[in-house]
Amino acid sequence: MKNGAFPHDNAAVPNVERVLPLFSLKGRTAIVSGAGAGIGLAVAQAFAEAGANVAIWYNSNKQAVTSAEDIAKTYGVKCKAYQVNVTSAEAVDKAITEIIKEFNGRLDVFVANSGITWTEGAFIDGSVESARNVMSVNVDGVMWCAKSAGAHFRRQKEEGTTIDGKPLDNFIAGSFIATASMSGSIVNVPQLQAVYNSSKAAVIHFCKSLAVEWTGFARVNTVSPGYIITEISNFVPPETKTLWKDKIVMGREGRVGELKGAYLYLASDASSYTTGLDMIVDGGYSLP
């Protein structure tokens, strides 16, 4: 932006007329953090099915290693698991650079999906350590991933080359997607989770701001799931889930597979004119 105006015609247009090819990720490289299970693993599977080579990051769930092998075998792409601490800017930057070198010299998509919940009830009764941990993983983790991924997106657009100096084919713009939450826009009941809610609100606004900063070389969007059946919510008692369903227009929790389309859309050229979007996928919970 200069003098309050964005550069005209700064975003390239895909040279594709038919709709299905727009969703292809063939030959591209994607990194998905928090992909040991749940939403992140489903997203990695979707990207691989669409033709992408995928690096999946995990924190402690070593099942990710086997999952990566299964993805590679099933979809005929390169897929490998990496243990990365997203709260460390240095670890994130090192991992991203090494993955780009190890894969095909490029980065096309980054999904910042790592996140943890708040389980200590009212904020004033919870521990300072837990609050800091939620913010460190949910907010700092997204920022450090964005900082490193964005630098690679910008270099690729400016230089038109892979990391080892070869011509970069079919790179229109990078796509950075962060997993936020409907909790970033509403206040959940009956559970009390002010820290978690505010962490996701921060992610949404951070990504909207990056969408402005990164115009010309990358698109930035968020996906805000509602109540989705994953391991992260196994601790929730059945009576609480019943109260959730009372407030969901569709009357049930979502499945991780029902989020695949949202992430694939935002990762692919199908969303070439979409940036700064917070896509809420919550079965209608936020409507009433």
From Swiss-Prot:
Matching entries from PROSITE patterns are given as: ADH_SHORT
The similarity comment for this entry is: Belongs to the short-chain dehydrogenases/reductases (SDR) family.
Pathways involved:
Carbohydrate degradation; L-arabinose degradation via L-arabinitol; D-xylulose 5-phosphate from L-arabinose (fungal route): step 3/5
Briefly explain the null phenotype.
Decreases strongly levels of growth on solid medium and biomass accumulation during liquid cultivation for both L-arabinose and L-arabitol; and impairs L-xylulose reductase activity.
Would the keyword NADP turn up in this protein's UniProt record? yes
Top-level class of the enzyme under EC nomenclature: oxidoreductase
Active site located where?
Answer: S181, Y196, K200
Recorded source organism is: Hypocrea jecorina (strain QM6a)
What are the EC numbers?
A: 1.1.1.10
The recorded induction information for this protein reads: Transcription is repressed by D-glucose and induced by L-arabinose and L-arabitol.
What is any Pfam family matched here? adh_short_C2
**Full protein name:** L-xylulose reductase
Instruction: Enumerate the GO terms in the molecular function aspect.
Output: L-xylulose reductase (NADPH) activity; oxidoreductase activity, acting on NAD(P)H, oxygen as acceptor
Domain of life of the source: Eukaryota
Q: Where does NADP(+) bind?
A: I39, N113, K147, Y196, K200, I228, T230
Please name the GO terms of the biological process aspect recorded for this protein, alphabetically.
Answer: L-arabinose catabolic process to xylulose 5-phosphate
Its keywords, alphabetically, are: Arabinose catabolism, Carbohydrate metabolism, NADP, Oxidoreductase
| Function description | L-xylulose reductase involved in the catabolism of L-arabinose through an oxidoreductive pathway. Catalyzes the NADPH-dependent reduction of L-xylulose. Is also able to convert D-xylulose, D-ribulose, L-sorbose, and D-fructose to their corresponding polyols.
So what does this thing catalyse?
xylitol + NADP(+) = L-xylulose + NADPH + H(+)
* First and last residue of the signal peptide: none
